[in-house]
């Protein structure tokens, strides 16, 4: 699964808007949009935040 698909899957599973997920991760709404559209691969630090957030919510 591509990173963009993982972001959208996690967001939908948690019933979050793009804005709400952005707030949870400390990134901008535009960043979440780019990630989901597969326009940009996030930096390692941002990927780590995303995966840690998912793990804390029970999403693997």
Regions of interest found by a model, annotated:
Residues 10, 24, 35:
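Residues in the recognition helix of alpha-helical DNA-binding motifs
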Residues 5-20:
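Short basic helix-loop element that most often maps to the first helix and adjoining turn
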Residues 43-60:
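DNA major-groove recognition helix of helix-turn-helix/homeodomain DNA-binding modules
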Residues 16, 27, 59:
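Short glycine/serine/threonine/alanine-rich loop segments
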Residues 1, 11-13, 27:
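Short amphipathic helical patch at the helix-1/turn junction of helix-turn-helix
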């Amino acid at each position: 699964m591509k990173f963009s698909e993982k972001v959208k899957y996690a967001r939908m599973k948690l019933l979050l808007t793009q804005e709400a997920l952005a707030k949870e991760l400390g990134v901008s709404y535009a960043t979440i949009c780019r990630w989901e559209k597969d326009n940009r691969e996030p930096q390692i630090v941002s990927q780590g935040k995303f995966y840690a957030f998912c793990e804390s919510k029970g999403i693997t």
